[in-house]
Amino acid sequence: NANTASTTSSDCLDASAGHYVDSTAGTAQTTQTACIAGTYNANTGSTTSSDCLDADAGYYVPTTGQTSQTECAAGTYQASTGQSSCIDADAGYYVPTTGQSSQTECAEGTYQSLTGQSTCIDADPGYYIDAGGSSDQIPCALGTYQPDAGQTSCLDADPGHYVDSTAQTTQTACAAGTYQASTGQSSCNVADAGYYVGSTGQTSQTECAAGTYQASTGQSSCTDADAGYY
C-alpha cells in the first residue's frame, strides 16, 4: 500500500497476477515486483519469486509481468524451460505445429533451404535428395533422369537411349544411325561403316547384308551394290 493514511490491513493490496511481493524483505512493502521474462504467474497475492513459473519447453514468455506463457509458433521451437523466445527451425528442418520442443529433419526426397519453416519441399522432377536434413536438391547427373517429384535417386537412361545434360526429366531415344548398348549414357554411338541402324532407340548396329554396302558412318540403311559389283 503506497498510501500514507491507511488504517487497516485491508487497505493493503494483493500482488497482481504476473507479480509478487517478496515476503523475505519484510512487511511494509510499497511496490510489487514483476515476474521476469521467461516466467509467468496467473495468481494474485504471490509472496515469492518462486511463485513465478518457468515457461514450459515449447513455450516462451517474452516480457516481464506476464500472467501466461505463449506457444512457440509453427516453424519455431524451444527445447529449454524458462525462455523468453523461440528458435527458428534450421535450414533442412521444419516444425509443423505450435508448442514444439524440437525441430524435425526433412525426410529424404525433400528439402528446406530457409530457416523457420513449418514444411519441407519435395525435390523437383529432374532432381533428387538422398539424405535427410538437406537444405538443397541435387540435379540428376548426365546419363540419368527423374520424371517425378520427391525422389531419392535418379534413373539411368535405358539401353538405346541417352541423357545429354543434367537435371533432366526424360531420356531421349538414340536416333536412326546411332545406338547405345549400355545403361546410364549421355550419348549414342555412331554406326560404323559397313553397318547401319534402321530405327530409333536401338541397342546395336546391324551388318550390311550380302550384296549391299555402306561406306559412311552413322547411317540408317545400306546401299545395293552396283551392277558388276558385289
Language model: regions and residue ranges:
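Disulfide-rich, cysteine-dense extracellular ectodomains and adjacent flexible linkers of secreted
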Residues: N1-Y230
